[in-house]
Amino acid sequence: GAAGVLVSRLCEPSAEVGMIAAETVRSYDDGGVRIVSSPLARAVDTARIIARVFDIAGYPCEGPELDERLTERFYGSFEGKTCEEIASEQPEAYAQYRAQGECDLAEVERSEVVGKRVRDAVLEAARVCRDDQSLIVVSHGSAIARGIVSLLGLDPAVFNGLRGVDNCHWSELVPVGMSTFKSAAINGWRLASHNIGSREDILGA
């Protein structure tokens, strides 16, 4: 979060979520949306506000549906602590995490595991979308980045070229070429934009 605490699966409330909803609707010109969300409170709050704004704007909206696979990466014994606290209390584990981005010592969820579950959730949701719908997936910074990398056909345990998505920011993926959502699992995805937001002072996912 913005306070620098690894909140991961701790259900802290979301903030400034109306902004992302308004920005999403402002750039929208399609035939309907389907919303799928992590079940953590801060994500559900965001998803419901987005759905409400679409409803007020008169656009057809399905969801939000909740999917456990979209939860944030699990940070094991690092949960709920600042980096300073982790470095002081678990120096060996912290050093491993800083060097590798992984930490079996603290039982941090492996990047490839996070990426696969997020990818699977997105693909499953995309397959049931109509061709004229857009899919909005509400998740969390580290999970989003690893899910995107996995959707692009890369290994998130190896490729570290995408940072986590900041609070009230979003990324956009589109099916390759003229593919539909239903065929994107075969033809692949293209990252159209990443970590886009309307306020630079809202950071920290």
Regions found by a protein language model. Name each.
Residues 45-48, 146-150:
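A short acidic (Asp/Glu
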Residues 19-26, 51, 115, 119-127, ...:
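Generic structural signal for well-ordered alpha-helical scaffold segments
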Residues 141-145:
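GST superfamily/GST-like fold recognition
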Residues 56, 73-85, 127, 131-133, ...:
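Acidic, low-complexity terminal tails and accessory targeting/binding regions
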Residues 30-39, 63-66, 134-138:
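Short glycine-rich phosphate-binding loop at a beta-alpha junction
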